[in-house]
Amino acid sequence: MEPTVQDDPQRSLERIRSELWDPTVCLERVAPGVTPHLDLSSLGLHSVRESALGAYADLGRGELDRAVATLRAVLTHQYDAPGRPWDGTFRVTAEQADPPGADAVEWLHYDPNWRQFLGAILAVTVLDHRAVLPADVVDGVSAAVVRCAIGEPEERIPEWYTNPNLLHAWVDAHAGLFTGDDTLVERGRRRAQQTIDRFEHASDVDEYNSPTYDGVDLLAAALWVVHPPTPHFAAWGRSLLDGLCDRISTLVDTQLACVCGPYWRAYGIALDRYVSLLGLWLHVAGVERVLPAAVDPGTDHVHDLWFLPLVTRLASSVTPPWQLRPVDSERRYVQRFDDVVAISILRPGRNVGWATGPVPEFAADQYVPFVAHCVRRDGTVAHLGVRPGEDVELVDAGEVTRDAFRVRLKSSGRPVTVGIDGVELQVEANRLVDRDGVVVVESASAKTSRWTPMPSGWSLHAADPELLITLTPHA
């Protein structure tokens, strides 16, 4: 692989934050790259979560005054609405309107998971920096963490929803420690055990192989180890780190700087095209090209870069047990979840992964059941991901030959739109062909379907579409 000059992500973060900091409200503006293909920066919005993470970063650099001002501003954006489903969560932006009462729609008018993210960020801020914070800020932050805990409806987070369960278990237990409430501590311990039991039953997390949410799970596990509210958390956190790092180490191709698919939840296919939480962890571990070479406010998903100071601090304390190594011979990895099977194959110069079974109902637009990465002649990497569209119920994928793969998408005969992520693919004779010819995508219904360009690649509209994908790596 050709070497790529990588900007220092920490310096990039400091530069971006200095550009986005708004001293008039003591918060950070929303960056253009937060929502890919939709620049919201002209609206003058201010991000609450990233501002809290910025305060944590400032405390680590000794910038106490700005951190204190930011924390005081952040605390004003927590909802205090007992009995409402948004009680205890935070506005996503400072300008977000209050939820419209009984007509409020979850994820549209409020983000319930901001209880978990802001609760964890604020709790670790107090735990790491209590000694330098003014008493009113310590009290205010601690009270906000407690409100995050008690505002969470008991049954809102399904058992399979890994990342908020991991975070909220820790937030609950620490809220109990902050107040001396043993009931909250025990509630957090029960949620943690429930999540660990599922992890041990399946030998992995439900949000399997997700470049962003694996990073959140690593962060939560590290918090359990570094600041365990009970001894159980330390042991369970270490078990989570061991299991996650083992699987991720197997699926990471350090030469191609990618994670072999399939992905249960992904915002992108190529780690060097957007910022992911897992990319931050791998960067801290010394893996190259797992973040964009240059990160600026317009980089896709740039807001996840704000986690870098916290990831760096946690990684230095827990030393994740990575076993990262080049792919010099074939690796195969199989993961089963009831009626879904995920298969990953890594060979020198290319890797491919697919899942067979029902499409998840939650976050189906982030599901990528077929993923391929393949090296070109010039050393760059071609990336391909197949995303089932709405109404796709089942994916049936597998090997045809060593270099050819078939992907069938079942939709009860209804026409569906399938997304093909791959910005460097071009249409040739109604096939999608990578610029170096290392990836070719053909439709079995080529005569009755057409490829349509979209920002991240192409889409195909057909009934029960079937794709034949051929890889020809130049190793």
Residue ranges and their predicted role:
Residues 120-124, 139-323:
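Extracellular polysaccharide-recognition and catalytic grooves
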Residues 2-117, 121-123, 130, 138-153, ...:
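Ser/Thr/Asn(+Pro)-rich, low-complexity disordered segments
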